[in-house]
Swiss-Prot record:
Gene: matK
Protein name in the entry: Maturase K
InterPro entries, sorted: Domain_X, Maturase_MatK, Maturase_MatK_N
PANTHER family for this protein: MATURASE K (PTHR34811:SF1)
Task of the protein: Usually encoded in the trnK tRNA gene intron. Probably assists in splicing its own and other chloroplast group II introns.
Residues passing through the membrane, by range: none
Organism: Disporum sessile (Japanese fairy bells)
Plastid as UniProt keyword: yes
Domain of life per record: Eukaryota
GO MF entries: RNA binding
Length: 516
């Protein structure tokens, strides 16, 4: 524990003391605005209420001026908690200012983590590989490692935790007392903290707000959990929040945590002891984590007990054991990053001949397999109004007012994204069915717009219409393998798994598969 405490103190030695004055700087809000927050309040709600995007800078200056007034933030929070009956313009200003303060403060408190990334990169050279930023880079790791493992624990990271715990976590990195007081005020005065954690679509205030603010504190909590879980000697990655909840890992997206040293963790006079496990692997994305091991089932049960007590005594969070499921890999498939993954066991008979004697040896081969979860994906398409619950394609009614090129372009992007994301599936037939459903949904949308039947529409547009739904993947793959000397027939590409190393976020249509 003394070694761990010393590491914690050394790692957090660069604490920041002067962050609160940045809240009054205009460039902080400009930084938050240009951080790639798709669909943030800086764009859409301004247009909804009759303002244009250029007025955002004026509102920022107006906010900074009013923040110098005494108790203005108290009035701001109180107004944001009221309904729209207080007046249309007054409600808009309250909501807009409240959102700017939350996103601006989130940009400020990210500074200590940004500086830590700079210092740690200067102290120790890190391998510069942009491929590690891709989500798909994790699957070659799974293919290489998971076929040799026996058990896997699927962990749903518990949330939300108490707001005071979030403040205490941030206090380890920030020693600016005004900033901490401001954070406590911001959280305690906010009546609907649970809506921060689980945004309610029926509420304007939470449907598009607070994403950056929430993701930063959620990942601060997850980072603290992982930091203390494996007792890392150095910070292995940097979390930078984005609007959709994925976080680009600037160093290693995954890693093999070797030699998990026997540790004694004292939680309320209780001691938990663990043994070394050189084949333990930990992978996390969003709210789900996977802990896999080649060891016995009892060791996995010890880890489960440890995690439950860890959340309870360190984070003061009542974690239920059912949130951690232990399964044997050879008998279980698990959802991860939109894929249904499993380890296939293929029996193999090998004939060995020595002199006049021959032997028949029975053995097995293990292979990590990834397939498309068709039923959940159809459910996601159904929620997006592309098909019915049973998978029958339907027209996208809200797109009927767009031009033909826009309609085809939108459906084409959806099919290309699905094709790229699920290119690593071992069974492409399911992917082709999904793409066919999207193609037919596009045709139905165009037919609804022009008030024609699908057959009449396709006859008028020609047979070459909608070819981009199917031809782009073959063109890309044929270009990749055209320079190889080994013959690689195109029909074999449909059975090969191709991992694209430029995918930095999970597809929206599969995002719900990985959230608890």
């Amino acid at each position: 524990m003394e070694x761990l405490q010393g590491y914690l103190e050394x790692d957090r030695s660069r604490q920041q003391y002067f962050l609160y004055p940045l809240l009054f700087q205009e460039y902080i809000y400009t930084l938050a605005h240009g951080h790639g927050l798709n669909g943030s309040i800086f764009d859409e709600p301004v247009e909804i209420f009759g303002f244009d995007n250029k007025s955002s800078s004026v509102l920022v200056k107006r906010l900074i001026t009013r923040m110098y007034q005494q108790n203005y933030l108290v009035y701001l929070v109180n107004d944001s908690n009221q309904n729209r009956s207080i007046g249309r313009n007054h409600f808009f200003y309250s909501q807009f200012f409240f959102q700017m303060v939350s996103e601006g403060f989130a940009a400020i408190v990210e500074i200590p983590f940004s500086l830590q990334l700079v210092f740690s990169s200067x102290e120790x050279e890190r391998p510069k590989s942009h491929n590690l930023r891709s989500i798909h880079s994790i699957f070659p790791f799974l293919e290489d490692k998971f076929s040799h493992l026996n058990y896997v624990s699927e962990i749903l990271i518990p949330h939300p935790i108490h707001m005071e715990t979030l403040v205490q976590i941030l206090q380890c990195w920030v020693r600016d007392v005004p900033s901490l007081h401001f954070l406590r005020f911001f959280l305690h005065e906010y009546d609907n903290w649970n809506s921060f954690i689980t945004p309610n679509k029926s509420s304007y205030a939470f449907s598009k707000e607070n994403k950056r603010f929430f993701w930063f504190f959620y990942n601060s909590y997850v980072f603290e959990f992982e930091f203390l879980l494996v007792f890392l000697r150095k910070q292995s990655y940097y979390l930078q929040s984005t609007s959709f909840g994925x976080f680009l890992d600037r160093x290693h997206f995954y890693g093999k945590k070797e030699r998990l040293i026997s540790a004694c963790c004292n939680y309320s006079q209780k001691t938990l002891r663990f043994f070394k496990d050189p084949f333990m692997h930990y992978i996390r994305y969003q709210g789900k984590a996977i802990l896999a091991s080649r060891d016995t089932h009892i060791l996995m049960k010890k880890w489960k007990c440890y995690l439950v007590n860890f959340w309870q005594y360190y984070f003061h969070f009542l974690s239920y054991p059912y949130r951690i499921q232990i399964n044997q890999l050879k008998n279980h498939s698990f959802f991860f990053l939109g894929y249904l993954s499993s380890v296939l066991i293929n029996p193999l008979a090998v004939k060995n001949k020595m002199l006049d004697h021959s032997f028949l040896i029975d053995t097995v081969t293990k292979k990590f397999d990834t397939t498309i979860p068709v039923i959940p994906l159809i459910g996601s398409l159904s929620k997006a109004k592309f098909c019915t619950v049973s998978g029958y394609p339907s027209s996208k009614t809200i797109w009927a007012d767009l031009s033909d090129s826009d309609i085809v372009g939108r459906f084409g992007r959806i099919c290309r994204n699905l094709s790229h994301y699920y290119s690593g599936s071992s069974k492409k037939q399911s992917l082709y069915r999904i793409k066919y459903x999207x193609r037919l949904s596009c045709a139905r949308t165009l037919a609804r717009k022009h008030k024609r039947t699908i057959r009449t529409l396709l006859q008028r547009l020609g047979s070459g219409f909608l070819e981009e739904f199917f031809t782009e993947e073959e063109q890309v793959l044929s270009l990749i393998f055209s320079k190889t000397t080994i013959p690689f027939p195109l029909y074999r590409l449909h059975r090969e798994r191709i991992w694209y190393l430029d995918i930095i976020r999970i597809n929206d249509l599969t995002n719900h598969l990985d959230w608890p």
